[in-house]
Amino acid sequence: MRKGLVAVLAVAALVGVGVAGLPVAERYAASRIKAEIERDGQASVGTVEVGLIDRRVVLTDFRSRAFGDLTIRRWETSGIAGSFGDLLAGRRPFSSFALGDPLRADRVELADAHIADPSTGASWSVGSLRIDGLDLAAYDADATGPHRLAILAARIAAALRLRHAEARNASHVLAFAGDTVFVRSAALHGVDRGKIGALVIADIEATPKGTAEASLKIDDIRAQEIGLRRALTQVGDRSHPGRPLGRIEIGSASATGFGGTLLSSNGVSLESVSLETVRQTVDSSRSRLRVEDLVLRPGANLEAARLRVLLQAMGLSELRLGLDCTGAERRSKGELAVPECSVSVADLGEMKLSAEFEGADEALWRAVDNGDAAALPRSSVALASAKLMLVDRGAIDRSVRALAAVTGRPAADARANLASEIRGYQPPDILITQEFTKLLDTAARFIEQGGTLVVEARPDPPLGLAAASRLGIAGPDLVHLLGLSATLSR
């Protein structure tokens, strides 16, 4: 019993000595970190605070000229992956963190951070930034030239994993142009080396240089399953300026609450835009794009006067449009399709377009995925069929009334004259055949009767890119080349 008591007292004494010496060790580690940061004269720090138990380092008034002009009022990193020996000695990753170095930490918090590139005028600022579950792999930090910051940012993003990140009052000044993009808050979830599980942005504004009002505002942006790896690889390449970014994969995305002078000065308002992609198999997917409540109300300015007069003649004060388009790709079968793309205009009508392509090969997907337009002419993709449907819900009557108001003639005469002009239309450099005349007659009857006009194309054989060049020869037979037909129904 007595020996056990002595052992307990000995352990307690050791713990007591350790606890008593902890502040001394933390102050020593802080001094070593500060000395290491300022050793080469490229950086300075106001104060350094170290917590050995939670592997925490807090820097205040940090400044660096190692990669642009960087200032951070407060920088706290906790749960840092590293040994106690490194922490006590002030070695990396606890000090003099260099570009390209890996870093793992449970949490990183920044307050009032700003980085600028004096050579281009580009800058990034953030009022506060919190990152949970940081895992940054080593990356290539060798980048030079005017796009250095963008290249490094892309490489860092491609090497980054994190559980959650949230930024507030962030802004970016574009290189050379000087335009500013401001974001009140942004949050990322599940970032994995260029893939983002979820993104939420609130209150984003874009303001041109030298102006006080934002040209574009968006209240809310949300997205899920974002794939940026291809784009980050392109931007992270030293030769990336001017090259296309390629395809960015998005599972779903939406933006609501559009505003700003760019829209308001043209009498435009927009409620929402959304995109959803469903991946059915590894190589097949289906996407849907929707634009809701796009409204055009011509303003009082001179530029909008002509449109305002036209709408008034049609008995309208505004144009209210909606867009709903779906697309599908089945790569293993070499198929690409637009099952339906519709544009509706309130009180006027609707236009629907669909198309199917075959022979969608590797050259086409390379052009789509990488933005490699030079690969497109080598593709054997061909148009198999297409359909255009026009549904009249008042557009013809209103247009005829407007035409009558302009010409000062009765609406019935205006309608008859318009139908007659369509029947007699003879486009230059087009072979006028009996089938072509029938198409024009169907279109003219659409003006006379209204209803639904359907124009279909079924080229036989399917129209490839090489065959499409025949459209430019003198006097092509469009009806035969495209397999055109037209029908009218009430």
PLM regions: where:
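Hydrophobic membrane-insertion alpha-helices, especially the h-region
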Residues: 4-21
